[in-house]
Amino acid sequence: MKKIIIGGCACLAGIGIAVGTYLYETAPSTHLPSKTEKPQQQESLPGNGDTLQTVESNGPVGYALTDELHITYDEGRHWSRVPIGIEALFAGEYNGQENELIEQSFFLSEDLTAFLYVEGADDQRVKLLYSLDQGHTWNDADIGGMIAPRFRKVDFLNEDHGYVVYTGERTMSSEATKVYMTHDSGETWTEVYHPDHYRLLYDGNFIDEKTGFLSYGTLNPEEPDLYVTQDGGQSWVPARIEIPDEYHLIFTTAETPYVEGNDLVLLVNQGSSGDYKGGKVKGKFISKDNGLSWSFQKEVDADE
């Protein structure tokens, strides 16, 4: 009798395991940010051959890049390793130098540190590794999309709101543009609309949660090609930039606008082959309608 009871219990246990396995495998998956505990801090000592050198910094926060990525929050006195492979930071359609991170592909502050990277060899995905506690823990966020990025940029307007812009699928002089927004410090990202425009992207930014810009044209443009949104990326329209006749074919590439006092300022440079005054000046334009139209103000030094 005992053998019968034991056999019956074993049979029921086996059925329970099988049912549980089936329910687990068929349940919908939920993508949650993963956390990685921070490794022990490594002190950088003067005179040590392995002393890390800051490549770029924002106040006391900076990074160093060797065969690993390190971060400091106290001007280089202490360093901690960022848990990411170097190759992921440069993956995609990038052929530049790898002795420093791709420009604009990271964000450094004492409250939030973030690095864009690419996951996967074939089906590449753009992701964000970020920390909200000065590197004690690191979170992974899936930005979205399945394309190998060329241009890539991450920025945060404040502790909650940020954006990612990247491009990919380049064919000759055209490519796709993707724009994503976060409102929870980088944990989740939502794709917003982008202009129905496929020229190569020069740069893009948001100056607040609603107002953003995308500047197109990198291959010998004849005039600036700037798009603006005033509703957080739900719609985009071409900005009107009034180029004086004497600067036609000279000021050709719009940079990203910025706030100066009560005005929006736009600098328009001469592109990669400009030679007006040695290519050392830009045009400064002012907008009074939040970026819809721009009026020429004056020439400024190219390094402004």
Which residues does each PLM region occupy?
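Extracellular glycan-interacting surfaces
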Residues: 1-304
